[in-house]
Amino acid sequence: MARKTPIERYRNIGISAHIDAGKTTTTERILFYTGVNHKIGEVHDGAATMDWMEQEQERGITITSAATTAFWKGMGGNYPEHRINIIDTPGHVDFTIEVERSMRVLDGACMVYCAVGGVQPQSETVWRQANKYKVPRLAFVNKMDRTGANFFKVYDQLRLRLKANPVPVVVPIGAEENFKGVVDLIKMKAIIWDEASQGTKFDYVDIPAELAETCKEWREKMVEVAAEASEDLMNKYLEEGDLPEADIVKALRDRTIACEIQPMLCGTAFKNKGVQRMLDAVIDFLPSPVDIPPVKGELENGEEAERKASDEEKFSSLAFKIMTDPFVGQLIFFRVYSGVVNSGDTLLNSTKGKKERLGRILQMHANQREEIKEVRAGDIAAAVGLKEATTGDTLCDPANPIVLERMVFPEPVISQAVEPKTKADQEKMGLALNRLAQEDPSFRVQTDEESGQTIISGMGELHLEILVDRMKREFGVEATVGKPQVAYRETIRSTAKDVDGKFVKQSGGRGQYGHAVITLEPNEQGKGYEFFDEIKGGVIPREYIPAVDKGIQDTLKSGVLAGFPVVDVKVHLTFGSYHDVDSNENAFRMAGSMAFKEAMRKANPVVLEPMMAVEVETPEDYMGNVMGDLSGRRGIVQGMEDMVGGGKIVRAEVPLSEMFGYSTSLRSLAQGRATYTMEFKHYAEAPRNVAEAIISAKSK
């Protein structure tokens, strides 16, 4: 089967936004306009398409699929058909893991901002993640019809708050209820959309006289940015004072793909204006899979290799989301980086070292799913029938194994005990929790060895709340939830040199003998545990050295102060001794464990607590209350800023343990007019009085 759309005409994009910026409406309109251009299966007449839109509007759809495929020929039908795969990204900070996961498989992104609210805290988190994965992006300022809408204010905020380099390629005609359309700065024509056809038809008209100066000024800025793409263009621009349309588009495209600039557009999705021009910008400026560097991975021998976005390459893909579908069961969404695969083929899950047969392959479209026989480089699809795969796994050709760059998922910072309400819920709860943990790698489930309770851990109170709610809605499990517990850690602040660990046991017959000497020192934050074998002259035989390491690793799970996991330490195994008959692995494991415990006591152990980056948006009148309250929670205020449309943003770093129930107290502090977001920042040493309270609470 030949490829329907050349890979150069693929666009794998995400649409990302703060909760209220209007992402769903924007995405919905994209599906509507692309659906009008290209119908899958039977071709409807215009009226039926409109009906579909209306009925979807009544239901207030959100795309439930993790990836949806649409087609676009340009708003004037002037492009060859392009295939746009839209990957859904959530808009809440507790789910940044979801955003991170989708950023990993995107080639480009549309960042949607509210013309009134501007750049909000969540927008910054998403922007940072897009920077981390070097995702080229566009900015779309939505809700231009709302009271207080201001395109140029959002432009300033993108520069100041995100340190972005936005380049407007359109300028709005009017704002608020007078928002009429946009001026296309590349064509220097105004675009007015036809309201009767819900924006599917439009006219190019002359620029309104009152906007002529503004447009001239912004066009000059845009052309200058384009000219900076190369020396030749700059010379051409200096000679002629302008550049041809094709040169401008190509130069802006090159600079967008290099992440140097972000083309900026605007509109109102709700009123059917502007999304059409944004889709053209996706084609003009965002990369196809062949425009970005090939994906890198690791071969079996540990060497680095890359896989080019080509059908001729060996097959490689990444599973990026797992969903449970009421009709077909578990769906694994995967992004194909190279090669071709057919339903029925055997794949290797190289992350887990297991082979599996690929069952059905589904492609999701706006309002229906299509079963397909094969997928090729650049495609995004869902697989049915893969039992082993979880988020972040590489699925590849069994004859050519490769593990693509692994996704790094954050450690949970909060945990709660959950108990089923009835005996019948017990079994269902186990199944439900496992299924949810499979879908979401930042959610963990374990059993507390001492109490036998089931403990769930995640990225924040809301994260756990939503998972418990899903357990009830999707799996019918009623559960009671304990008080949230903070995930503390232990580490050391000084070095303990040459500490002995000796395990000797003589009890008739063969004894036990293991002796290890270690030096323990602090490691860099986030580096975890490192072990260095510095044994000389065979004082400990080679085969027993891994046992010492294993003994230490077992002990790391429970520190000497209050039994919290130990992080960021280096251990040097420097000396030891053995007995020809009595030494064995177990004895050296015990010796390693004893040496580590003793060394840790001597190395100034401390308790670490998770610190959260908290941002509060509040009207100015309540500023004093909010700041005082944050200080009372051991918070350190790190800055304040004015918000678009009045109000203040307070940024602070606050220990997680002090933030429980914060939403309730913020509501009363600011009479329900303040909002906040919170995300994990780093671990920090707990002050002595706090650490003492934590240790004594743990020992009760």
Curated annotation (Swiss-Prot):
PROSITE patterns: G_TR_1 (PS00301), G_TR_2 (PS51722)
Any one GO molecular function term: GTPase activity
Pfam assignment, any one: GTP_EFTU
Subcellular location: Cytoplasm
Primary site of residence: cytoplasm
GO CC annotations on file: cytoplasm
GO biological process terms held by the UniProt record: ribosome disassembly
Entry keyword set: Cytoplasm, Elongation factor, GTP-binding, Nucleotide-binding, Protein biosynthesis
Domain of life: Bacteria
Residues annotated as domain tr-type G: 8-290
Residues annotated as binding GTP: 17-24, 88-92, 142-145
NCBIfam families per the UniProt record, alphabetical: EF-G, PRK12740.1-5, small_GTP
General function of this protein: Catalyzes the GTP-dependent ribosomal translocation step during translation elongation. During this step, the ribosome changes from the pre-translocational (PRE) to the post-translocational (POST) state as the newly formed A-site-bound peptidyl-tRNA and P-site-bound deacylated tRNA move to the P and E sites, respectively. Catalyzes the coordinated movement of the two tRNA molecules, the mRNA and conformational changes in the ribosome.
Similarity field: Belongs to the TRAFAC class translation factor GTPase superfamily. Classic translation factor GTPase family. EF-G/EF-2 subfamily.
Protein name in the entry: Elongation factor G 2
